[in-house]
Amino acid sequence: MTDVLARFNSGKLWDFDGGIHPPEMKSQSNQTPITKAPLTEDFYIPVKQHAGDAGNLLVKEGDYVLKGQPLTQGDGLRMLPVHAPTSGTVIAIAPHIAAHPSGLSELAVHIHADGKDQWREQNPIDDFLSQSAEQLIEKIYQAGIAGLGGAVFPTAAKIDSAQKKVKLLIINGAECEPYITCDDRLMRDNPDEIIEGIRILRYILRPEKVVIAVEDNKPEAVQSIKNALQGANDIEIRVIPTKYPSGAAKQLIQILTGMEVPAGQRSSSIGVLMQNVGTAFAIKRAIINDEPLIERVVTLTGDKIPNKGNQWVRFGTPISFLLKNVGYQYDERLPVFLGGPMMGLTLPNLDAPITKLGNCILAPDHFEYDPQAREQSCIRCSACSDACPVHLMPQQLYWYARSEDHEKSEEYSLKDCIECGLCAYVCPSHIPLIQYFRQEKAKIWEIKDKAKKAEEAKLRFEAKQRRLEREEQARKLRSQRAAEARREELANQKGVDPVKAALERLKQKQAAITEKPKISALKTVVNEKGEVLPDNSEVMALRKARRLARQQAISTENSVLTQVDSGTQSDNSDVQKNPENSTALDGKKAAIAAALARAKAKKLAQNNTESVSDNVTAVKSAVQNTEISAPSDSAEKTETDPKKVAIAAAIARAKAKKAAQNNTESASDNVSAVKSAVQNTEISAPSDSAEKTKTDPKKAAIAAAIARAKAKKLAQQQSNKTE
């Protein structure tokens, strides 16, 4: 920074590479003082008129607004508000044609003027020294002031970021465009207010040096500023050679200090800050007069305009309205430019409004304007590179822009292009290089903006997730605390924790349902010899329990069989005593004995456990096997066979009864008939002669088997018929 001041204090003027001296046409419009443009009936104020984001709307359709009333509200120093240019009613808030070569629309507030031009309440101050630097920066921000030299960067943000870094404050009055004279006339007509605005900036920034730089083709403006200073030495004036584009910020710094601003950095990095003379004037009006930025000086020039000059124009005024008031006659063959011939934009629609960016309306005639020649191929002549004041390679950037190679465009420093138009001016192939560069910049900006928004959305989502997690944890913690407090309260009242008691009951219930005898982990014992052997005591205990259950089942079955046997023996004795009545009595007694056996067996089966039932089944099975094998036994066992025959008959009758219950009534009758036959067979068996008694048990068993088979067959037939 010391080098900057040392170089500036040397009084030397440096030069920059490139640049041209185009024909000068300033005399068309700088011969008369600035006048006020008449007010139109309808204003269209774009909500975004600066380099940054649009503010939030404060008005709605149907609202009545006063002159200077804010229409939007910013959120941060780079989101500038816009203000009502006059009093009137908000007709609509809708897209309106923009002052851009694309012809696209942008959101604007449509105000219908009431003709009163009534100001909102104002609070002017006489002495800005009574305010702090922060208060002054806030006033500049609330006034919506942006750089009026062409960049329209928010002034408050620029000043705030450069505080305590600035050693040299440069006020740019070079105005190098060949047709534009708005700054020239402003310095001639309002030098005192410009000086007052510069002193406000000096008070905020506290630089060591302040200088006003003016090109040598504006002698009247230089003299006017000197007269306003009245010999004060706090502000210097430096007259620089006329050369395009000496009014560009980096080129003017190089002329005054011989230093270049590093690529990708701001001038404050070397201790320099630059403001336009129009911006200094707007700062004075905002601080001293409490007037927001609602108008600016606009140069109306070109041979198609009879009444050339500079006018104070309110923002939102349609360009067509301005041109009509200065005698312009529309000609579709000749374009109208917003800005100068070097950096200006072609307007496809003259209904676009004047904004903070609009410093000149140029309407040339056919003597001044040559139609765009047909674009030809690049011949690699390097004329564009030689003329470029920032040492770029426009021919390479041209190829990358055409092929949309965004990475290469950035690699070759497209962002450092100041869009001065020199490359297109000197190109022998008539290639509109600036158009290609602007389009490429817009595409790169759009890609980065989408990536930025995606990253911001990701950060917002992650922040939301963290917030939701914190809220969920806090909710769970509150619930736990409330539950603990409730349990403590109940425990204090009853002496027992209800939750723990409920859990204990649930565990006991589940254990009772699912409890089964389990063998614990393998245990070992040491015998007398010192050998380690497995401890099978639990397994042996389980086996013993199962064995006792089987024995109990067998004993129960034996008791049933004993009762049946005793009944059979008594029947046989009665038959032997009364042979005449044996046929009638044996059948009845056998039926009674069988019924008693069935009842006792059923009762015992209901009272015993499942294990006992299984053992009973096994015993019955063994008994049946004994029945089948009975005929093959020796003659010595034949005397006890009648008992088994009676058991077999009882089993046959039980099976017949079960089959009868599952089948139809007719099947039941047939089964009953079979049972009667079986009974008759059993009854008639003892009445045979004494010689046949030894063989009767076998025949009885065979007859019982045949009866069972017939009963089963009849039951199956009846079931099939029923189906």
Curated annotation (Swiss-Prot):
Q: Which InterPro entries match?
A: 4Fe4S_Fe-S-bd, 4Fe4S_Fe_S_CS, Ion_transpt_RnfC/RsxC, Nuo51_FMN-bd, Nuo51_FMN-bd_sf, RnfC_N
- Name where it's found: Cell inner membrane
Q: How is the cofactor bound?
A: Binds 2 [4Fe-4S] clusters per subunit.
Give the start-end ranges of region Disordered.
Answer: 559-586, 655-701
Domain named 4Fe-4S ferredoxin-type: which ranges?
A: 369-398, 408-437
Query: What kind of membrane protein is this, topologically?
Result: Peripheral membrane protein
Gene Ontology CC entries for this record: plasma membrane
| Listed Polar residues bias regions | 559-583, 661-687
State which Enzyme Commission number(s) the record gives: 7.-.-.-
Record-annotated residues binding [4Fe-4S] cluster 2? 388, 417, 420, 423
Could you list this entry's UniProt keywords, alphabetically sorted.
4Fe-4S, Cell inner membrane, Cell membrane, Electron transport, Iron, Iron-sulfur, Membrane, Metal-binding, Repeat, Translocase, Transport
Compositional bias of kind Basic and acidic residues:
689-699
One Gene Ontology term from the biological process aspect of the record? electron transport chain
Lineage: superkingdom: Bacteria
GO MF annotation: an example: metal ion binding
Q: Which cofactor does it need?
A: [4Fe-4S] cluster
- Sites binding [4Fe-4S] cluster 1 sit at 378, 381, 384, 427
Q: What does this protein do?
A: Part of a membrane-bound complex that couples electron transfer with translocation of ions across the membrane.
Describe the family membership recorded for this protein in Swiss-Prot or TrEMBL. Answer: Belongs to the 4Fe4S bacterial-type ferredoxin family. RnfC subfamily.
Q: What is this protein called?
A: Ion-translocating oxidoreductase complex subunit C
* Lineage of the species this protein comes from: Bacteria, Pseudomonadati, Pseudomonadota, Gammaproteobacteria, Pasteurellales
Q: Which gene encodes it?
A: rnfC
